[in-house]
Amino acid sequence: MRKIYTSVEELIGGTPLLELRQIEQAEGLGATLLAKLEYLNPAGSAKDRVAKAMLDDAETKGLLKPGSVIIEPTSGNTGIGLAVVAATRGYRTIIVMPDTMSMERRLLMSAYGAELVLTPGAKGMAGSIEKAEELAREIPGSFIPGQFDNPANAAAHRATTGPEIWEDTQGKVDFFVAGVGTGGTITGTGEYLKAQNPNVKVIAVEPASSPLLSKGVAGPHGLQGIGANFVPKVLNTQVYDEIIPVTDEDAYAAGRQIGRKEGVLVGISSGAALWAAVQVAKRPENKGKTIVVLLPDTGDRYLSTPMFSE
């Protein structure tokens, strides 16, 4: 039976769960390890969900109208998602990002028609947010979706990602593991899963060299996409039961491993989440449990980074 879609937006969500059997075997895991493959969204990341949700919400509230200019500070994937959704709706888009983000991310956003403004990497996302706000004051009719503060971010995952995981596992999920960038994924998905079963354990993943959530200390790190060096308003700090810090090297190694063992090419933050999920799966008390790890994006936008340049 034929099914024809009329907009790329209709392809957002509904990503599959893949059991990582080769990694289970290689690591001697007694638990079942399931990966939520968010790179199968049309623009290659979980942020497609967020981009669509934030623009839908803004249009409904009258904050975004024909002729409006979208300005967003982002480390990359939200910018790519916004560029795609904005392209289908005819909005001009300006993305503000730290100059330390990968060249592939920059080129992708430009390919979808977004304009780029780069800020000093040393200032992190805070520097990009400051610049975006400055541009918004200068450009008439501009709108900042504000993924770090926008409730529509977490709401997107509460409405889609969480229910998809629950349905695909038929409610058999013991742990949910996700990195913390804006906090939208872990907040929305975690809240939904815990509402279905309060015994589901939610594990937050952060950079070991910027353990802001676990130790209150921020610092430079190589895990693009997580570890914003401030606590985002979107993040519900009550939703997670444990925080696992991951080193750059462990994240890179796990990211390479899933490509070589499972034929799944993912990005740096996916490597971090996967490494943490494997540690949870290795615990003797978790034998027979089901662990779902969310892998946020594709690896092809990181081929020039240390993860793949060995």
Cite the ranges covered by each PLM segment.
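PLP-dependent amino-acid enzyme catalytic core
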Residues: M1-E310
